[in-house]
Amino acid sequence: MSQNAQDPAQIGEDDMGEAFGPLPVSKLEEFGISSSDCKKLAESGYNTVESIAFTPKKQLLLVKGVSEAKADKILAEAARLVPMGFTTATEFHARRNELISITTGSKNLDAILGGGMETGSITELYGEFRTGKSQLCHTLAVTCQLPVDMGGGEGKCLYIDTENTFRPTRLLAVAERFGLNGEEVLDNVAYARAYNADHQLQLLMQASAMMAESRFSLLIVDSLTSLYRTDFSGRGELSARQMHLAKFLRGLMRLADEFGVAVVITNQVVAQVDGATAFTADAKKPIGGNIVAHASTTRLSLRKGRGNQRICRIADSPCLPEADAVFAIGPEGIIDPVD
């Protein structure tokens, strides 16, 4: 690591300045909102002014003690602090150029992704078991802590595990590869195991509070849909499942917008049983339907290759062309295949 590079151990509250954007909800006290109301908002998951500005009025009214008149006042003051009107394409382009990408550990994979996992958006990884989804997540949990000039995000990682597949020993191996201190890398990963769909949603509220306090560059959910498949069964609960899933995805989108973090979600696949199956080479589709498809900015399809090799295909992206890349899973995480 270069002498000017930031040590992951030093990533913390001191680095969470105005440069990183989100304003704490307490900022509203300067504009006539009482400290008790700000505290109630924070307890309900609204830890930043941005989170309030992005929230519909009917949601604010659910906060205990917030009347309609008070909600109007809070939203009006939040709108003054957070620009949400029209801007020129030139200004938007300049903001887009400030976004960074987090390296995957594979040059082949980074090449088709334009540098790695984009911050400020949601990237979905879907595929069968043993296609490298969780291994890629483990590698990203370390590379997000690297300095920007090494392909990192200079921030911590928040990891929500729904399948009990998180293994710290994998992080230590990846850390050694990149010359990072293993203990410090583990300290910079905030881990939580989700046990049901409601708990998964509650963890997202806790994530918002943590991101308001310290600098995070990556949020991982591995996997997005496994608990929904067990908590909601049959067609009778399909509508309730999709509504709950949509609420969770909206929370992910809000965190990506507020804090500029890269959000990476993994997804399982299910076999297609319609008439089109006979004409399709790969008769499997990701779970979650259109709700997940529309929420994900970039969708990556992973499949097995020869030996430890895996193939990633860009299935959907607003700015990247469809392309394939071959990568491998090694003891030190995601790597390029060795010929």
Swiss-Prot record:
Cited PANTHER family: DNA REPAIR PROTEIN RAD51 HOMOLOG 1 (PTHR22942:SF39), RECA/RAD51/RADA DNA STRAND-PAIRING FAMILY MEMBER (PTHR22942)
One MF term in the entry's GO annotations: double-stranded DNA binding
Keyword DNA repair: yes
Top-level taxon of the source organism: Eukaryota
Residues holding ATP: 127-134
UniProt name for this protein: DNA repair protein RAD51
Similarity remark: Belongs to the RecA family. RAD51 subfamily.
GO biological process: chromosome organization involved in meiotic cell cycle; DNA recombinase assembly; DNA strand invasion; double-strand break repair involved in meiotic recombination; G2/M transition of mitotic cell cycle; heteroduplex formation; mating type switching; meiotic joint molecule formation
Role, per record: Required both for recombination and for the repair of DNA damage caused by X-rays.
Alphabetized UniProt keyword annotations: ATP-binding, DNA damage, DNA recombination, DNA repair, Nucleotide-binding, Nucleus
Region (Disordered): 1-21
GO cellular component assignments: chromosome, centromeric region; condensed nuclear chromosome; mitochondrial chromosome; site of double-strand break
Protein localization: Nucleus
